A protein has these predicted regions:
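Gly/Pro-rich hinge or "lid" segments in bacterial periplasmic/extracellular proteins
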Residues: 31-45, 329-330, 351-352, 359-371, ...
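Surface-exposed binding/hinge segments that line
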Residues: 2, 300-308, 315, 472-611, ...
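Bilobed periplasmic-binding protein-like "clamshell/Venus-flytrap" ligand-binding domains
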Residues: 128-131, 171-179, 254-261, 266-306, ...
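Extracellular/periplasmic solute-recognition and catalytic clefts
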Residues: 38-44, 48-102, 198-239, 642, ...
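Aromatic- and charge-enriched surface segment that lines or borders ligand/interaction sites
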Residues: 106-117, 408-474, 521, 686-688
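Long beta-strand-rich cores associated with HINT superfamily self-processing modules
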Residues: 300, 304-347, 362-365, 596, ...
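Append "and occasionally in soluble cytosolic enzymes with long acidic Gly/Pro-rich linkers
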Residues: 110-195, 279-281, 285, 292, ...
Length: 792
């Protein structure tokens, strides 16, 4: 059987584009000339006219936030001269994990029993100590900031209770508390060790380490063409894998690897219950052996000035990335000058990574800049683990059960390994998923129009640079290959179905022509929800094909390498399209040569004519001559200027930009469900909940809480209400995952199946509003089903 899931957001795509265009046409502005002599104001989905990013230490940040010369401090903790000023507010997100790591060579801790006993002593001592700012004792790797926390909440609660228990009389002495045994890495880890456990050892047997979430996630992400995978990058089980798998020994690694491999390859036939059960098994397997043990997590608290008129509003943070996320740049606006003001951001450190959109932008400051300059196909949902449409809309068809699969059209294309040349898949190709995309293009900053070749070339790049056979030709980068592997493993074919063309009159005598490519992508074994599947390999690139080709040629010629690791191995510079003046000079000469030759790479021979290629290189040459760099994209902002401590970005006021004003505004102040009551009535569990909301009124905000009913609304927006419950048997196996029944009187009901075997069960229930799965209000209930079929 083939199931279809179609999802569109009213706030994206043609509807929002037309709303933005119509609004722009209605508000004729004095500035901003647009064709035929008409003056048309454009109001896109992002606000400030300029963004300035300055490096600032905590003292400077505190002063700047206080006097509104800085609007937002991203990624750091400011220091104020006294109490936090009343006009300065903050939002919290997941900052880091606190993890114990045992030295595998230590004779004290060769056995799992010794490690687990020592870890228990340390965790209990930490739990009984005082509170440290931002630290939460939580000895489980999936936290309340993870969208899948509901799937693990009983396990997390049990782990906390277990770690608080005193050890029995037979326990091994707490050798790990010896002053010569325990080390610390990171400021918070040092504080905890000193205050709870004594001095810090110089040559320790076990180390308490603070592991920032940014580093854990960025090392697994990919920038190519603004693919932002893997799609499961915000899941708690994936973070647990990244955090704990490196410490697994030979005895405990196979079970964890098997569970992880099944999760990321979609090898599941039992539906959501089987998947959730496997996620829980993976986390359990990662904790066995106590080679690495989670103590808890630290929150990241980021500050902004909200005073009127100089402050900002409409601030959204991501539960995992904080303010360093695409949604922040696309929502934040100045209170006094929403569209023509200058936004001042502070960051704690200068960028020290190379600026290239393949293996670069790895430090926090560079990532912040790239979230503004680039425009991904989809962006992370700020308060769950799924994705929001940005430059694509999608419809998913997926095989369910034991169907023979989805036939891939014979004329669909698939890159050849090694060369990346696009070949027909032939008559016998099949897939388990088909995603049909409508792509919302816009011109690149060098003036070239985004076309089909730009959408397809990232696939060719993936198969060329992901093939180790190309190592000898300098056309292989292990780091790049690793993050592109999920795409390469699953792609079954790509077919461009058509390019729709529509005309929109935005003013008298002014007409916009909108081209919308429709592309089918065929996949095999893609896991996750519909949007996660759609975000695996969308036909999209925020950089043009000719820039990707230029970077490839620079690497093949030995001028640079995409990633820091490969640059160090080959002893060449890390490819930087902006700040490496020597490389830029070489690239300028190469562009002139390619323009003269009308150069096209082999995968594009049938998609790009010689004249089109010549025009592309000509435009890129002119862009570099004018701007002094090669960072060409088609996102909301362009790079205007830079120094070692300052980056300035200009807004792109392009009338064909497809996303109109207010596209992401709904994610400001997400509502939250609060379960007020949960009771068992026979074979049903009934719950009642309230909706806690923050509503804007004039220049201020009002906190409100009201019963969650079918008529409850968030201002003018109806609430999207999603419920979920887990049913877990006495052995700990997840035997059911489903939504609750929402009755007309507002109560939620879980109806336990009549065929449910007698015994003890755990029910976990949660309710989410507008997709907000962070820090859920959940209930864990113990239910007994009697032998006669009625609850005992």
């Amino acid at each position: 059987m083939i199931a279809r899931a179609r999802w569109r957001r009213a706030s994206t795509g043609r509807w929002r584009y037309l709303a933005g265009a119509a609004f722009a046409a209605a508000l004729i502005a004095a500035g901003g000339q647009s064709g035929a002599g008409h003056s048309v104001g454009h109001f896109p989905s992002y606000y400030p006219d300029e963004i300035r990013i300055d490096v600032a230490d905590p003292e400077a940040a505190g002063k700047g936030l206080g006097d509104a010369t800085m609007h937002v401090y991203v990624g750091g903790v400011p220091k104020f001269g006294g109490p936090v000023p009343v006009q300065v507010k903050s939002l919290k997100s997941l900052g880091s994990f606190l993890v114990l790591t045992f030295d595998p060579a230590s004779p004290r801790f060769q056995s799992a029993e010794a490690r687990c006993t020592a870890a228990h002593f340390i965790l209990r001592r930490v739990a009984q100590g005082g509170k440290d700012a931002g630290f939460a004792f939580h000895p489980y790797p999936v936290t309340p900031y993870h969208a899948d926390y509901l799937h693990h909440i009983d396990k997390a609660n049990a782990a906390t209770l277990e770690r608080m228990k005193p050890l029995g009389w037979h326990a091994v002495p707490p050798v790990a508390l010896d002053a010569q045994a325990l080390g610390a890495k990171g400021k918070l880890a040092e504080t905890i060790v000193k205050s709870r456990l004594g001095s810090i050892a110089e040559r320790p047997d076990v180390v308490l380490e603070e592991v920032p979430i940014d580093g854990l996630v960025s090392a697994a992400s990919v920038q190519l063409g603004s693919w932002t995978g893997p799609p499961w990058i915000k899941e708690g089980w994936f973070h647990a894998w990244r955090l704990l798998a490196p410490g697994l020994d030979a005895e405990h690694r196979p079970a964890a690897e098997e569970a992880y491999d099944r999760l990321i390859h979609g090898q599941l036939r039992g539906g959501l219950a089987e998947r959730v059960d496997l996620e829980r098994k993976l986390v359990a397997a990662l904790g066995r052996g106590c080679n690495r043990v989670v103590l808890g997590y630290a929150e990241r608290e980021e500050y902004f000035n909200e005073s009127y008129p100089p402050g900002v509003e409409n601030v959204v943070n991501d539960a995992i990335a904080g303010f360093n996320a695409p949604v922040f740049i696309r929502t934040v606006k100045l209170k006094e000058y929403p569209w023509n003001g200058k936004l001042h951001l502070g960051v704690p450190a200068a960028s020290d990574s190379a600026w290239n959109p393949v293996g670069g932008f790895t430090d926090a400051t560079a990532r912040l800049m790239w979230t503004a300059v680039a425009d991904p196909a989809m962006i992370p949902f700020p308060f769950n683990a799924s994705w929001m449409p940005n430059r694509v809309q999608a419809e998913l068809s997926k095989v369910e059960g034991r169907s023979g699969g989805i036939k891939v059209p014979a004329d669909a294309l698939r890159p050849r390994a090694g060369s990346g040349e696009l070949e027909r898949v032939g008559d016998w190709a099949a897939a388990s998923e088909k995603v049909t995309y409508e792509v919302l293009p816009s011109p690149f900053e060098d003036g070239t129009e985004q076309g089909v070749a730009d959408l397809l070339y990232p696939y060719a790049f993936t198969y060329r640079w992901g093939d180790e056979a190309n190592r000898g030709a300098n056309a292989y980068d292990p780091g790049v290959a690793a993050v592109l592997a999920p795409i390469k493993e699953r792609l079954a074919g790509v077919k461009v179905v058509r390019v729709n063309e529509t005309k929109h009159a935005v003013a008298e005598g002014l007409e916009l022509i909108v081209k919308t490519p429709v592309v089918e992508v065929y996949l095999n074994g893609a896991p996750g929800d519909e949007r996660q599947v759609a975000n695996l390999a969308p036909p999209w690139s925020t950089v043009p094909w000719h820039l990707l080709v230029l970077m490839e040629e620079a690497v093949v010629r030995g001028w640079a390498a995409f990633s820091a690791e490969e640059a160090a191995r080959r002893k060449v510079p890390w490819l930087d399209l902006v700040r490496d003046r020597t490389l830029i000079a070489k690239l300028q000469e190469l562009v002139v040569q390619f323009e003269r030759e009308s150069y096209r790479p082999a995968p594009l021979k049938d998609l790009v004519t010689a004249e089109e290629a010549r025009a592309r290189w000509r435009s890129l040459r002119a862009f570099a001559e004018k701007n002094g760099h090669f960072l060409v994209a088609n996102g909301p902002y362009r790079l205007k200027s830079w120094t070692s401590d300052t980056i300035v970005l200009d807004a792109v006021r392009e009338m064909t930009y497809p996303l109109g004003f207010g596209t992401f505004d709904r994610f400001v102040f997400p509502p939250r469900a609060e379960i007020e009551q949960a009771v068992q009535e026979g074979r049903s569990v009934k719950l009642r909940a309230s909706a806690a909301m923050t509503l804007k009124g004039g220049r201020g905000y009002t906190e409100t809480k009201e019963p969650l009913l079918h008529t409850t609304a968030r201002g003018v927006y109806p609430l999207l209400v999603v419920s979920r419950y887990l049913l877990i048997d006495a052995a700990g196996k997840v035997v059911g995952v489903d939504k609750m029944r929402w009755a007309e009187d507002g109560h939620f009901a879980i109806d336990l199946a009549p065929q449910l075997p007698p015994g003890d069960y755990t029910v976990i229930a949660g309710i989410f509003l507008d997709g907000n799965a962070v820090r859920p209000s959940a209930r864990v209930l113990r239910v007994h089903i009697g032998a006669a079929g009625s609850p005992g």
